[in-house]
């Protein structure tokens, strides 16, 4: 399953995983799991989280190591996000509800997730998603970004 991930995806997941592996012992607690997945653009429900945890946490000790995490993310990515999950994620980023994600809104959310990005990195993320070149990301552009593999 995890062997279907690209090197870039694995590197992204490793980075996200290590953000939440505070003590660097190679495991994350289950309650951190939801936060990690949301930082990667996934939007699991509580029930889905519980199911995923039960599936992966083989020894039932409440922590997940990186190989288990990779398997789980690969599984989750196979079930492509529903329209509603994408809309929900868009609303998280669109703080003022104007239908656009600005660089400032993106920076705010990413910072809250523990991602310290430079202004250049944030601007680059917006540029990559900004199809019509207006300097912001609208819902259609967001959907395109979330669903393009």
From Swiss-Prot:
Q: Does the keyword Magnesium apply?
A: no
Say if the entry is tagged with keyword Cytoplasm.
no
Alphabetized, the UniProt keywords read: Acetylation, Calcium, Metal-binding, Methylation, Repeat
GO CC, any one term:
myosin II complex
On this chain, the residues bearing N-acetylalanine are 2
Where along this sequence does the record place binding of Ca(2+) 1?
Answer: 21, 23, 25, 27, 32
**Residues annotated to bind Ca(2+) 4:** 130, 132, 134, 136, 141
Q: Where does Ca(2+) 3 bind?
A: 94, 96, 98, 105
The UniProt entry, under InterPro entries, shows: CALM/Myosin/TropC-like, EF-hand-dom_pair, EF_Hand_1_Ca_BS, EF_hand_dom
| Disulfide topology | none
Q: Which GO terms describe its molecular function?
A: calcium ion binding
The EF-hand domain covers 8-43, 44-79, 81-116, 117-149
| Signal sequence residues | none
Query: Binding residues for Ca(2+) 2, per the UniProt record?
Result: 57, 59, 61, 63, 68
Q: What does this protein do?
A: Calmodulin mediates the control of a large number of enzymes, ion channels and other proteins by Ca(2+). Among the enzymes to be stimulated by the calmodulin-Ca(2+) complex are a number of protein kinases and phosphatases.
Tell me the protein family, please. Belongs to the calmodulin family.
Classification via PANTHER family:
CALMODULIN LIKE 3 (PTHR23048:SF0), MYOSIN LIGHT CHAIN 1, 3 (PTHR23048)
Q: What else is known?
A: This protein has four functional calcium-binding sites.
Q: What is this protein identified as?
A: Calmodulin-2
**Which species is the source of this protein?**
Branchiostoma lanceolatum (Common lancelet)
Q: Where is the organism placed in the taxonomic lineage, from the top?
A: Eukaryota, Metazoa, Chordata, Cephalochordata, Leptocardii
């Amino acid at each position: 399953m995890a062997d279907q991930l690209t090197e870039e995806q694995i590197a992204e997941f490793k980075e996200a995983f290590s953000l939440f592996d505070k003590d660097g012992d190679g495991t994350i607690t289950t309650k951190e799991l939801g936060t990690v997945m949301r930082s990667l653009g996934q939007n699991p429900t509580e029930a889905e989280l519980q199911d995923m945890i039960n599936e992966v946490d083989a020894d039932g000790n409440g922590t997940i190591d990186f190989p288990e995490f990779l398997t789980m993310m690969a599984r989750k990515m196979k079930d492509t996000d529903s329209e509603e999950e994408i809309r929900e994620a868009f609303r998280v980023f669109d703080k003022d509800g104007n239908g656009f994600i600005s660089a400032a809104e993106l920076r705010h959310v990413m910072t809250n997730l523990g991602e310290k990005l430079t202004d250049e990195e944030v601007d680059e993320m917006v540029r990559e998603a900004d199809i019509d070149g207006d300097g912001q990301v609208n819902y259609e552009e967001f959907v395109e970004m979330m669903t393009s593999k």
